[in-house]
Regions:
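Acidic, surface-exposed loops and disordered segments
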Residues: 1-175
Length: 175
């Protein structure tokens, strides 16, 4: 399946089944995270079978249920864009493996992530087998997202990918 198809299939999921992630899938996720860390210089860490991070008032407020696995993206405070870019590489790998995810900014408890001096926890991604596959949210039209004097196939494909990209509260503030 190509990356655009994965992007079309992927939707945020907040409720998860009580089902462990198989060791073969864990190995693929760990491998992707290691590659991404080497390229990005971020400190992305994955936690399996660790429900405490989402066992808090804020997690319940965010309507998260049965989250036992998560990915913590740690880096310098100015690494937000890198966190999004490289985090989405991992999210799409999870989607390819049949797993569901959700980007989580504030509605979680204390993470077990190791945070070194000068770093901060940038964002968390919940991970597991969803109760559902999530639902698509309304996206802005390509005309609302960008402008080009002449439309080309590569531009249209790129803008389609932009329209599918996750953004905070689905605001899609690209311009």
């Amino acid at each position: 399946m190509d990356i655009l198809e994965l992007m079309k299939e992927r939707h945020s999921v907040r409720q998860y089944k009580d089902q462990a992630i198989e060791s073969s899938k864990r190995e693929e996720i760990n491998s992707r995270i290691n590659a991404v860390n080497a390229e990005s210089k971020l400190s992305i860490q994955v936690f399996y079978d660790e429900p405490k991070c989402f066992n808090s008032f804020m997690a319940h407020y965010g309507k998260f249920e049965n989250v036992k696995n998560y990915i913590a993206i740690v880096g310098n405070k100015n690494d937000q864009e890198k966190a999004g870019y490289y985090g989405e590489k991992i999210v799409l790998k999870c989607q390819e493996l049949g797993l569901n995810t959700c980007w989580v900014a504030m509605t979680h408890g204390k993470s077990k992530a190791e945070i070194k001096r000068g770093q901060k926890l940038l964002i968390i991604i919940s991970l597991g087998y969803g109760e559902t596959q999530g639902v698509p949210h309304k996206s802005k039209s390509i005309a609302e997202l960008g402008k080009a004097d002449q439309s080309t196939e590569w531009f249209d494909k790129g803008m389609e990918a932009v329209s599918l990209a996750p953004t905070a509260v689905n605001q899609q503030k690209f311009l």
